[in-house]
Amino acid sequence: MAPPAKRAKRGWVPPGYKYLGPGNSLDQGEPTNPSDAAAKEHDEAYDQYIKSGKNPYLYFSAADQRFIDQTKDAKDWGGKVGHYFFRTKRAFAPKLATDSEPGTSGVSRAGKRTRPPAYIFINQARAKKKLTSSAAQQSSQTMSDGTSQPDGGNAVHSAARVERAADGPGGSGGGGSGGGGVGVSTGSYDNQTHYRFLGDGWVEITALATRLVHLNMPKSENYCRIRVHNTTDTSVKGNMAKDDAHEQIWTPWSLVDANAWGVWLQPSDWQYICNTMSQLNLVSLDQEIFNVVLKTVTEQDSGGQAIKIYNNDLTACMMVAVDSNNILPYTPAANSMETLGFYPWKPTIASPYRYYFCVDRDLSVTYENQEGTIEHNVMGTPKGMNSQFFTIENTQQITLLRTGDEFATGTYYFDTNPVKLTHTWQTNRQLGQPPLLSTFPEADTDAGTLTAQGSRHGATQMEVNWVSEAIRTRPAQVGFCQPHNDFEASRAGPFAAPKVPADVTQGVDREANGSVRYSYGKQHGENWAAHGPAPERYTWDETNFGSGRDTRDGFIQSAPLVVPPPLNGILTNANPIGTKNDIHFSNVFNSYGPLTAFSHPSPVYPQGQIWDKELDLEHKPRLHITAPFVCKNNAPGQMLVRLGPNLTDQYDPNGATLSRIVTYGTFFWKGKLTMRAKLRANTTWNPVYQVSVEDNGNSYMSVTKWLPTATGNMQSVPLITRPVARNTY
């Protein structure tokens, strides 16, 4: 008779776990959850330490740090307890020696056993002191209306990163920064998208993005107030739409902007999300900077024999600030196509940070073939009551990074409303119960008939005895007509009034109401081989009959606005409608009211903006045209970077120019955007239309557009968002 099988050694394990706890065997079967899996990996590492003659229980090891990293987002109580246990161990226990780095444990295979350098303890103390000070300061800093930033700023949430930096060589500590030291990698390059199915049809989507960002010295170290007044264009009658007059504050900082769908998701991800999900919402955002490299450029000899020499500068610094409390003007870069770009393998640049400054603008409204002269084409001067000049140095806490350092913003949590990823086909005429048929067709080509007029039953909103589909009472209005292609006057000059893409009129009479024109370049999806210096352009015509059903009907290359406009296309307060021809009711009629229902603007992949800041006014708009998600209270803080002034010995504070060492830098930006989606239930008998590519090389959805050419040319045209129809009533 065979001896009974030995029961596996099982130490103290909390309920629901197999490996989380001391004294366990390594053959307990499959882990029960991610925290238990991290504990199993941790136990296996401890086993290897013991076999090599080291005691991991009395010393803090790399396995302990790995367990901390793997459980930092743990949702289960056991993972949280284990996470903080080993963080406490890290604070008090000496470090275990490795083959490449001597520590304070008893065994070291190579090299002389030495004490840790004194600066490590000094940096630890500085990091903890500055962390406490920054956290206290951040918790007390609020917006002008008393609303705090949801993420708590970069100081509080980057505590783990600061502690890790203080442990490593060259730790800089403080704020949201850390140090890995020269030649030490401080991050990973990751552009994957992960889908975690949570049950009940919910899916957590984690989009990771990484970019190599190039940063040059600013053109000037000063803030500049610059005026643009293109009188050459606007002095020509009919060119009001070409008016560019404004003043802006140009800053020496650059904006690291990831607020575009193409930064986070590859085309196949967008296809999968839109084909299988019914709604989408934002959850959280994390950003970090690592592997900072700063270099100086010097020239030897001159003329045609000049040779440029590039050297690492270990003393130069890069400055980083995050506007967590939204103090500075909000300037999303997607509308100017200046985000981080849509191709992870291509280096990119940050967008120069600039913002509008208040100045009055007076321009006469003109039209084509107008007689007479233009009376007004002037700009005003700054006014004391409206002038707001912001500087980053006076409004933000700035972190200084050197070569090898890193920085993290912490986690921002969104408070937004979900957006549907299906389109509606029902207009007012399709709400409710169809009329009762009196006769049925006898053949497939025949039509049915209704009861004769005068004998029908039903509710109408007309004082006649008719009951027809045109006048039946409906519960609400789906979509609405609104004035469009109109220019409104403002103190800063004329502007095209924003339009909601909710028009439901038929055929060409709708005049592309609510359409948005996208012009973009090589980093954002342009077919540069075909277009050359001119940008590629598409119009997102969301209200086209085929929009959401057929991509080529949604994205067109024709422009909806004619410049200069004809007389009959312009309405001003001096022109009564009755004196003009070809003015349709849709140019002036507004059917928006308390009974109006309409769809939210669609996300536009890849060029569209993702989130937007809520306007700080007592009465908020129901939506924004620029982005599908509007952040309640604060939006994610804008990340700003610049190279610190690298001066020469010729610096003169009274001089007209700065004598600077030519310096540039590169760094890796990495982000994590977490979203939550709902799986779409299959309800129809018939197959549904979905986003799909075609073999035809001339079609809009030809697969060749998303494939590289022999010279590496890539194209990424806009993709639809709402391919599948849904019932709304």
Curated annotation (Swiss-Prot):
Stretches the record annotates as Phospholipase A2-like: 19-64
Compositional bias per record (Basic residues), positions renumbered to this chain: 1-10
Region Disordered, annotated ranges: 1-39, 96-115, 130-185
Compositional bias (Low complexity): 132-142
Sequence motif Nuclear localization signal, residues: 4-13
Residues noted as binding Mg(2+) in the record, renumbered to the chain: N325
InterPro entries: Capsid/spike_ssDNA_virus, Parvovirus_coat, Phospholipase_A2-like, VP1/VP2
Swiss-Prot/TrEMBL keywords: Capsid protein, Clathrin-mediated endocytosis of virus by host, Cytoplasmic inwards viral transport, Host nucleus, Host-virus interaction, Magnesium, Metal-binding, Microtubular inwards viral transport, T=1 icosahedral capsid protein, Viral attachment to host cell, Viral penetration into host cytoplasm, Viral penetration into host nucleus, Viral penetration via permeabilization of host membrane, Virion, Virus endocytosis by host, Virus entry into host cell
Biased amino acid composition, Gly residues: 168-184
GO cellular component: host cell; host cell nucleus; T=1 icosahedral viral capsid
UniProt cross-references to Gene3D superfamilies, sorted A to Z: Parvovirus coat protein VP1/VP2 (2.170.30.10)
Residue ranges, compositional bias (Polar residues): 25-35
MF-aspect GO terms: metal ion binding; structural molecule activity
Cellular localisation: Virion; Host nucleus
GO biological process, one term: virion attachment to host cell
UniProt note: domains: The N-terminus of VP1 is sequestered within the mature capsid. It contains a phospholipase A2-like region and putative nuclear localization signals.
Further facts: The capsids of autonomous parvoviruses expose a proportion of VP2 N-terminus and part of that sequence can be cleaved of to form VP3.
Entry function: Capsid protein self-assembles to form an icosahedral capsid with a T=1 symmetry, about 22 nm in diameter, and consisting of 60 copies of two size variants of the capsid proteins, VP1 and VP2, which differ by the presence of an N-terminal extension in the minor protein VP1. The capsid encapsulates the genomic ssDNA. Capsid proteins are responsible for the attachment to host cell receptors. This attachment induces virion internalization predominantly through clathrin-dependent endocytosis.
Family membership: Belongs to the parvoviridae capsid protein family.
Protein's recorded name: Capsid protein VP1
Native source species: Murine minute virus (strain MVMi)
